[in-house]
């Protein structure tokens, strides 16, 4: 027997929704849709929900499963599951009113508008011509992405969300389209996406809305002078001056460190560690030394290009990739301690002709850590999954395993550890009010765990979560890089 919690609400009789618990027998590979039907049959519960094809093709059975968008016919039920309606006005139980998004689509005239342009096409359209638009055309309108997007949930009127961005891009990249779709994208908040990747994670058709739609439209905006945001221009200017997307009044970490010539393991510092947080770079060197590992920190390395790729300023990215490829070509393994850098090196650099063996510090250390040297730390901690580590690199277990190896630590998981903190996608610099709202939401989750510190593996996340905790009056809760926690245990 398993327990399943279902949100119940009738707009005609109830003032607010509530969860009801049901116990049912779980059959092998039982889906949420099967569970809802079993509950209705056993309890005569009359739970209202939509369904049709049962094959993941119609999108009608979209729901929230443990807080994330999903198809009821595809998601396997589990003990303790919470089933809620999508984030739209609720009509009854799991049935929602989608008229607002349907009206938006109608207002934007989101259908092919080719006018006279079609008649002027003198050549046939090839597969290559439609390659970009095909990547985003398989949407089944389940609205899982809209209900899961962190920005939509806190700024509904400001950001059209991944569903509309994908829809607009479908026509922006269609060679027959004659409307100015880019203006629509800008009006709907093209630069208000954090690049968290949650929409891809919940999409039953694996549509990469940020990578294949938003990021590309941002590049088009830059090319025609409509972008980037003024606050993003400095990224490129700084890189052209010193190879880093940020400035510093400190001595860069690379200039401070003694290199271990001959080591086949290298450290890709990233801009933030080299210029803003050199102490974290030193912690990496010290922790590895405790484990008998020498690491080289080669000179000549430059920004990974992530700030440029995320904001559409792509024209000098190839040069950055080539420089880093040359610097790191003779190393067997490249270590990163910034999730954004790691994701960019792994996922974007191969598109520019560079494929290095890159590992996040947690995946590198998890099976090498000398636990006998670790000393007790009397501390309660929680962990924040950086978007570009958890979803961008698929690394979730390794950091937690390392934390739990440290004696004396009490680990409390927060409600939604993988919810975006608001630091990415150029949001913290370009739309700081959105970044702050998301940071405060994350900070509240941290507060609920009664943790002394929140651990993460991203300098950008560290900064934004710190701002969020300060904003809600939790200055006493520390924000620590995983390496800082390990350093404390090795002292």
Predicted regions and their residues:
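Eukaryote-biased recognition of intrinsically disordered, low-complexity regulatory segments
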Residues: 1-22
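Short strand-turn-strand beta-turns centered on an Asx-Gly dipeptide
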Residues: 7, 24-25, 64-68
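Short, structural beta-strand-to-alpha-helix junction motif
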Residues: 27-35, 76, 252
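Ferredoxin-type iron-sulfur electron-transfer modules in oxidoreductases and energy-metabolism complexes
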Residues: 30-42, 84-242, 319, 365, ...
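Immediate flanking context of iron-sulfur cluster ligation sites
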Residues: 37-70, 126-139, 180-197, 290-300, ...
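Short cysteine clusters
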Residues: 53, 58-61, 73, 139-145, ...
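Iron-sulfur-cluster electron-transfer modules
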Residues: 133, 141, 168-302, 306-353
């Amino acid at each position: 027997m398993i327990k399943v919690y279902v949100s119940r609400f009738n707009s005609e009789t109830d003032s607010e929704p509530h969860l009801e618990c049901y116990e049912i027998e779980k059959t092998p590979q039982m889906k949420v849709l099967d569970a809802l039907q079993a509950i209705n049959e056993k309890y005569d519960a009359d739970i209202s929900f939509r369904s049709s094809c049962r094959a993941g093709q119609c999108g009608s059975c979209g729901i929230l499963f443990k807080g994330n968008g999903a198809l009821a016919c595809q998601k396997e039920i589990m003990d303790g599951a919470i089933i809620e309606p999508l984030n739209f006005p609720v009509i009854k139980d799991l049935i929602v009113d989608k008229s607002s998004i349907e009206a938006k689509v109608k207002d934007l005239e989101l259908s092919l508008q080719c006018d006279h342009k079609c008649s002027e096409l003198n050549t046939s359209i090839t597969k290559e011509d439609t390659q970009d638009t095909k990547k985003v055309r398989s949407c089944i309108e389940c609205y899982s992405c809209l209900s899961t997007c962190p920005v939509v949930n806190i700024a509904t009127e400001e950001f059209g969300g991944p569903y509309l961005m994908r829809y607009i891009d479908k026509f922006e990249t269609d060679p027959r389209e004659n409307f100015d779709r880019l203006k629509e994208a800008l009006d709907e908040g093209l630069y208000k996406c954090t690049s968290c990747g949650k929409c891809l994670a919940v999409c039953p058709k694996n549509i990469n809305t940020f990578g294949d739609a938003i990021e590309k439209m941002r590049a088009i905006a830059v090319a025609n002078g409509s972008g980037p945001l003024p606050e993003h221009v400095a990224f490129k200017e700084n890189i052209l001056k010193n190879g880093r997307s940020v400035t510093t009044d400190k001595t860069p970490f690379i200039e401070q460190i003694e290199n271990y010539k001959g080591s086949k393991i290298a450290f890709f510092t990233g801009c933030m560690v080299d210029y803003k947080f050199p102490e974290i770079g030193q912690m990496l060197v010290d922790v590895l030394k405790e484990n008998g590992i020498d690491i080289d920190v080669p000179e000549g390395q430059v920004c990974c290009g992530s700030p440029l790729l995320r904001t559409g300023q792509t024209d000098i990215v190839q040069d950055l990739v080539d420089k880093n490829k040359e610097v790191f070509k003779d190393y067997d393994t490249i270590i990163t301690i910034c999730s954004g850098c790691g994701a960019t090196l792994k996922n974007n650099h191969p598109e520019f002709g560079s494929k290095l063996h890159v590992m996040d510090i947690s995946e590198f250390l998890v099976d090498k850590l000398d636990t006998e040297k670790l000393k007790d730390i009397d501390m309660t901690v929680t962990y924040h999954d950086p978007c570009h580590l958890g979803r961008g690199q698929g690394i979730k277990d390794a950091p937690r395993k390392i934390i739990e190896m440290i004696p004396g630590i009490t680990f409390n998981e927060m409600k939604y550890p993988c919810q975006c903190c608001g630091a990415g996608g150029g949001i913290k610099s370009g739309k700081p009010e959105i970044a702050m709202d998301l940071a405060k939401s994350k900070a509240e989750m941290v507060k609920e765990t009664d943790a002394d510190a929140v651990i993460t593996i991203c300098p950008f996340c560290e900064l934004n979560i710190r701002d969020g905790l300060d904003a809600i009056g939790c200055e006493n809760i520390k924000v620590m890089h995983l390496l800082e926690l390990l350093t404390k245990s090795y002292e």
